From Swiss-Prot:
Its cofactor is Mg(2+). ATP binds at E211, R218, R233, E262, F302, R374, K380. SUPFAM superfamilies: ATP-dependent DNA ligase DNA-binding domain, DNA ligase/mRNA capping enzyme, catalytic domain, Nucleic acid-binding proteins. Belongs to the ATP-dependent DNA ligase family. The lineage of its organism: Bacteria, Pseudomonadati, Myxococcota, Myxococcia, Myxococcales. It catalyses: ATP + (deoxyribonucleotide)n-3'-hydroxyl + 5'-phospho-(deoxyribonucleotide)m = (deoxyribonucleotide)n+m + AMP + diphosphate. This is Probable DNA ligase. Disulfide bonds: none annotated. InterPro entries: ATP-dep_DNA_ligase, DNA_ligae_ATP-dep_bac/arc, DNA_ligase_ATP-dep, DNA_ligase_ATP-dep_C, DNA_ligase_ATP-dep_cent, DNA_ligase_ATP-dep_CS, DNA_ligase_ATP-dep_N, DNA_ligase_N_sf. Keywords: ATP-binding, Cell cycle, Cell division, DNA damage, DNA recombination, DNA repair, DNA replication, Ligase, Magnesium, Metal-binding, Nucleotide-binding. DNA ligase that seals nicks in double-stranded DNA during DNA replication, DNA recombination and DNA repair.
Length: 519
């Protein structure tokens, strides 16, 4: 396939509002890919590089564009572009930055104007074309003539869509069947939706399992004989950073385990340290021995995906917890209460808050483990409203904030239309250290110059925002605005694809309106 065909598909999908039309266009493009092009082509349609990040920022890409002129006509094939990107990604050592820049310039010099724009945005991670994962799952299913549910299940197991698309297009249902839980290979974590309170959570779930919501780092721990590996929420292998977790799981008698839980730094009295303290244990360059002494970690588990040779993902939560309790002692399990009684639930919530924890998770007793999904089977209850939003832009500050990029433009994810929907701005809640850190980070994420009052950013950073409510607003395209928003913390453990959706925000607003009316 020629690159120009994928570029045209991307452009049409970006300009198309209807979900079904997007799916049809994407399915046609996927069908047209040759076997050796499928992994790269599916990755590009998902707005990402098969090679991952390749170490070129906006300045380098802009310089490559300025140093070359567009080709008169499109002539690049998908295979040769992918091969060029392989060479870019492989550049290492002294002078590798210059080598990557030269390779990119050589590629752009052979590309037409439309292809250059596509490639530049792809390299920078800015290819927002309205083809988010839900739409692509349906497109892969149509192109491969397999059920969308099977594609979705395979993506949950694989942790990414492109390899699933490649397998489905090559072998159909047989290819998808190979994606299953494997020891020492992480799967996407199951996620929770917000609920206004315990009464709302119990009304939705009936009798439910309530668990303390710990403000720690999500970990997925795999054990296969004597080998233990620990993976972060983003599926990064963090085993060397958390020897306490490894040792705790290695001591468990079961020969094989996959456990979901939280690693958390606790003070001597059992109260949690701030989230930022726990996250110091998960940096890229660590003095593990020193940090272990200064910031010791505890681990508490709340789910079992596999025990003693048996996969449990498809089992009801009640059965998974029985397996967890059989494999893991009380001291390593999150406190839990099964109830349908509102008073008992409220008391359990108060107990969690009194000990310094965030709140509760209310979980359906009958639901399977829906890896990678933020479904209605898990509901999180906190004292204050919070949302995980994406920073779309920032404004230069004044007064105490002069010289810092501070006033954040905040957006919710829009899976249907693609991209993000702005909900408001805030500079509240930021410490001096946070202002300095984010200003440096925003410079690296800037789309174009940072000289103007507003600096637009690549939508890569997720921030947890507390707010007092939502109000209708004609100022923002979603029709809603945050009321008294303030920053709680950056969620470097979350990807933009894991931010809260505009549908979640609208549901919160609907519940708020109903509560105000007494309905």
């Amino acid at each position: 396939m020629q690159l120009a065909e994928l570029v045209q598909t991307s452009d049409v999908v970006a300009r198309t509002a209807g979900r079904l039309e997007k799916i049809a266009r994407l399915a046609d493009a996927l069908r047209g890919l040759a076997p050796e092009e499928r992994l790269a082509g599916a990755s590009w349609l998902a707005g990402e590089l098969r090679q991952g990040r390749i170490g070129l920022g906006p300045a380098a890409v802009r310089a490559a564009l300025e140093a070359t002129a567009p080709a008169d006509a499109p002539a690049l094939a998908v295979r040769e572009v992918d091969a060029s990107l392989d060479r870019l990604a492989a550049a290492r050592g002294a002078g590798s930055g210059r080598e990557r820049a030269a390779l990119l310039a050589a590629l752009l010099a052979r590309a037409s104007a439309d292809e250059r724009d596509f490639l530049a945005r792809l390299v920078l991670g800015e290819l927002r074309q309205g083809a988010l994962e839900g739409v692509l799952v349906e497109a892969v299913a149509r192109a491969a003539a397999v059920p969308a549910g099977e594609v979705r299940r395979a993506v949950m197991m694989a942790g990414a869509l492109p390899p699933v698309a490649e397998a489905a297009l090559a072998e159909g249902a047989a290819g998808l069947s190979r994606f299953r839980l494997r020891l020492l290979e992480p799967v996407q974590p199951m996620l929770a939706q917000p609920a206004a309170g315990v009464d709302e959570a119990l009304a939705a779930l009936g009798e439910a399992a309530l668990e303390w919501k710990l403000d720690g780092a999500r970990v997925q721990v795999h054990k296969d004989g004597g080998e233990v590996r620990v993976f972060s929420r983003a599926l990064r292998d963090v085993t060397p950073a958390v020897p306490e977790v490894v040792e705790a799981v290695r001591r468990l008698p079961a020969s094989s385990l996959v456990l979901d839980g939280e690693a958390i730094a606790l003070r001597g009295d059992g109260a949690p340290e701030p989230f930022q303290v726990t996250m110091r244990r998960f940096g890229r360059k660590l003095d593990v021995a020193g940090l272990r002494e200064g910031v010791p970690l505890s681990v508490l588990f709340f789910d079992a995906l596999h025990t003693a040779g048996e996969d449990l993902i498809a089992r009801p939560a009640s059965e998974r917890h029985l397996a967890l309790a059989a494999a893991v002692p009380d001291a390593l399990r999150v406190p839990r209460l099964v109830t349908s009684d509102g008073a008992a639930a409220a008391a359990f919530l108060e107990g969690a808050l009194a000990r310094g924890h965030e709140g509760l998770l209310a979980k359906s007793l009958t639901a399977p483990y829906e890896a990678g999904r933020r479904g209605a089977s898990w509901l999180k209850v906190k004292r204050a409203h919070t949302l995980d939003l994406v920073v779309l832009a920032a404004e230069w500050g004044s007064g105490r904030r002069e010289g810092f990029l501070s006033n954040l433009h905040l957006g919710a994810r829009d899976p249907e239309g693609g991209g993000f929907v702005m909900l408001g701005k805030t500079f509240k809640g930021m410490t001096d250290a946070m202002l300095a850190w984010q200003t440096e980070r925003f410079r690296a994420l800037a789309l174009g110059s940072t000289d103007g009052y507003v600096v637009h950013l690549r939508p890569e950073l997720v921030v947890e925002v507390a707010f007092d409510g939502l109000q209708e607003s004609s100022r923002y395209p979603g029709g809603l605005a945050l009321r008294f928003a303030r920053v709680k913390r950056y969620r470097e453990d979350k990807r933009p694809e894991e931010a809260d959706t505009i549908a979640t925000v609208r549901a919160l607003h609907a519940r708020q309106v109903a509560a105000e009316r007494g309905t």
